[in-house]
Design a protein with these regions (language model features):
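Short, glycine/charged-enriched secondary-structure capping and boundary segments
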Residues: 21-24, 49-52, 95-98, 155-156, ...
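Beta-strand-turn-beta hairpins that frame and shape the catalytic cleft
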Residues: 2-6, 134-141, 226-232
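Active-site environment of divalent metal-dependent phosphoester hydrolases
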Residues: 13-18, 42-45, 86-91, 147-149, ...
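Active-site neighborhood of divalent metal-dependent phosphoester bond hydrolases
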Residues: 56-148, 152-173
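Glycine-rich phosphate-binding loop signature in dinucleotide/nucleotide-binding domains
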Residues: 26-31, 136, 170-173, 226-227, ...
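Acidic, His/Gly-rich catalytic cores of divalent-metal-dependent hydrolytic chemistry
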Residues: 190-292
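Active-site neighborhood of phospho(di)ester-bond hydrolases with catalytic His/Asp-centered motifs
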Residues: 9-10, 34-38, 43, 80-85, ...
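N-terminal active-site segment of His-dependent metallophosphoesterases
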Residues: 1-59, 65-70
Length: 292
């Protein structure tokens, strides 16, 4: 069975200009399946539109949203959308959220009701059905980590912590797990090696770094003697990058190889929408241009 060419996105954070750019790009590159690792909402000013698109693309019976003009032939493969810590906070009580993040969650909770009663119910039903983790025949998917799918951060310094690495990889039943949450793209190997993509001089003009063979157990047809240790891949953030690069980040995966995609989008438009909502702190707009 051929693995569907998959676009893996995370941490959209109610940023429609970034998400639209990412989705159009993924379709143009031939993506037939969409996996969202959570945090569709939070921080940004357009949670309803971001949810609308995920409720059509990242589901078991996906379809192309009518207001997303893309060229696509054939049928989409079943997608997946997971719960991030911001969805969890929205459905419960924000825990360990700073005041700015908490303000955005409280505003988002009210905003979801502004599209009408029926649509509001649809949003809450979708959010209530989100799973904390998922998997297919090749890969696992989580927002935070394999150990704590919703809340745990995995960051580059963790590659120097053998005990944490062992605990992170222990629950894995596949050769690779894709995560988000930290908003910093990277590949963490079980033996402590780390790869942090630098999508600049090594990047083609189209904003892609890769493809890179994961070479991990259970992916593709890599000979056994060439297989690398298992890997955790952070796909970065579409809506609020935090690695010093304001360009959106996502990953393409064909079952064996990954490519990191970094793209410019209309940061000013996304920021202006946040500035236009008095309940959202200006800082949430200002940070977008800094990639922090």
């Amino acid at each position: 069975m051929t693995y569907p060419f998959t676009a893996i996105i995370s941490d959209l954070h109610s940023n429609v200009p970034a998400l639209e750019t990412a989705l159009r790009d993924a379709f143009a590159r031939g993506a037939r399946r969409f996996v969202c690792l959570g945090d569709v909402v939070g921080y940004g000013a357009e949670p309803r539109m971001c949810l609308d698109w995920m409720m059509e693309l990242a589901i078991a019976e996906p379809r192309i949203p009518e207001n997303l003009a893309v060229e696509f032939e054939g049928e989409l493969e079943p997608g997946l959308c997971l719960m991030g810590n911001h969805e969890h906070a929205l459905m419960n009580t924000p825990e360990d959220f700073n005041p700015k993040a908490r303000a955005a969650i409280e505003w988002t909770r009210d905003e979801l009701g502004c599209g009408g009663r029926e649509r509001g119910f649809a949003y809450w039903n979708f959010l209530g059905e989100l799973r904390a983790e998922g998997m297919d025949e090749v890969a696992q998917f989580a927002h935070g980590s394999p150990r704590d799918p919703v809340r745990e951060y995995v960051v580059p310094r963790d590659s120097q912590d053998p005990l944490k690495l062992a605990a992170l990889f222990a629950p894995m039943t596949r050769g690779v797990c894709f995560i988000g949450h930290s908003h910093v793209p990277a590949v963490y190997y079980e033996d402590g090696r780390i790869f942090v993509p630098k999508v600049n001089s090594a990047t083609r003009e189209d904003g892609v770094e890769g493809p890179y063979s994961l070479g991990v157990p259970g992916t593709g047809s890599v000979p056994a003697e060439e297989k690398l240790p298992r890997a955790i891949v952070n796909v970065g953030s579409v809506g609020q990058p935090r690695d010093g690069d304001p360009r959106l980040s996502y990953v393409l995966f064909d079952g064996e190889n990954i490519s990191f995609v970094r793209l410019n989008y209309d940061v000013e438009a996304a920021a202006d929408k946040i500035f236009g909502v008095s309940e959202l702190p200006d800082y949430l707009a200002e940070r977008l241009s800094k990639g922090r």
